[in-house]
Amino acid sequence: MRIFKTYGQEAIALITENPYRLARDIRGIGFRTADQVAAKLGIAKEAMIRVRAGLSFGLAEATGQGHCVQVALCAPTGRAAKRLTESTGLEGRTIHRLLEADPKTGGFKRGEEHPLECDLLVVDEASMVDVLLMRSLLKALPDGAALLLVGDVDQLPSVGPGQVLADIIGSDAVPVIRLTEVFRQAAQSRIITNAHRINQGQMPELTAPEGSDFFFVEADEPEDAARKLLTVVQNRIPKRFGLDPVRDVQVLCPMNRGSLGARTLNIALQQALNPPGAQRVERFGWTFCPGDKVMQVANDYERDVFNGDLGIITAIDMEESALTVSFEGRAVEYGFGELDELVLAYATTIHKAQGSEYPVVVIPLATQHYAMLARNLLYTGVTRGKRLVVLVGQRKALAMAVRNGNARRRWSKLREWLQGSSRGSSTRIGPQAA
């Protein structure tokens, strides 16, 4: 009875879609009961929805009464922190927010003298963390606390110096668990299987059987690729899959510049999907209009929006010189002078998308991007797509990216210091050594 009072006429549909919502929404129903309902509905034990619910339950139990384990969850970007919250049901914060960044000093309030209050610190998307930020994080870790780093070492390394996650794994100084098994549902996805092929230096399967979620649209010249990309985004994906070309589709580019770069494609996609009308504002090299998809490009803790967050412009008030953006239903207002925090986001770079996921990803590939065509870049782009991935461009460019697995080595001495420490060396690992 409580179920129908909570969900109304949509109770059956909602529970069938996600039975684990029962544990979240209805008092007296826990994970185990919801899990029994899921089993009766035929949800497999290894289904991702069950994994997420189980993880949330496990963390909640660890932090619950009687266990006295304080768990802190963080990620390097706001978008990744939000995904962490959605996956676990616990609060995920950016590393900067966790460490209480001080804009006046450029440092952090949390450190050796004022450490974090946790027994277990979980860092997601750890491949994105550079040596300087990791140093600050470790200095703030209290004595006796455990650190769990979660990340995909095969993705792009951090924008800042070092390759912390790769060096930690390569040192053999700490326990490492590699998740390599592809479960049954995932094995049916061409996105997953082709991502694994790319990561192993093999060309992805480009033939698209019925029901495929991975496509390759060949185009010999960049101009042809740009035209085909616009057609795919504007017409083919909405008609065939019933998806919104603005809200559901994200174009990810290897580079920002060039005819197939993010900036040029943003302007072309804006013209195709949301042509500027009379109500517009031009600032910082962009034209903003109601209905445009935009990206926040800096962490703004006062507005509670973060680097990489996507939103839709809902209103422009010329009298007040203000623009309103909806971020997942939450309205945020910007003065015209603050619009340097926003860029059009129909297209963005793969680097900028790291740590995010999108329903549909479209990736242009051309030999003009030769300087950036690398296996880890392509792998990172492909793994951003949840329901559909479309590559548009030259087969030669795709092959160049797959073959180029020689990521530039970054020298930070972290691996050597860790190896020396694990052998009982007198090498000091800490602020002085760094």
Task: State each model region's role.
Residues 1-66, 70, 434:
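Accessory, non-ATPase domains that flank or precede helicase/AAA+ motor cores in DNA-metabolism machines
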Residues 62-66, 70, 74, 302-313, ...:
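Terminal-proximal interaction/regulatory segments of ATP-powered molecular machines
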Residues 78-82, 96, 100-106, 115, ...:
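Conserved helicase motor core of SF1/SF2 NTP-dependent helicases
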Residues 84-89, 110-118, 288, 353:
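Conserved motor-coupling elements within RecA-like helicase/translocase cores
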Residues 142, 287-290, 306, 353:
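Residue-level recognition of short, solvent-exposed, well-ordered loop/turn junctions
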Residues 153-303, 314, 323, 421, ...:
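Conserved helicase motor core of P-loop NTPases
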Residues 200, 296, 307-434:
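C-terminal accessory regions
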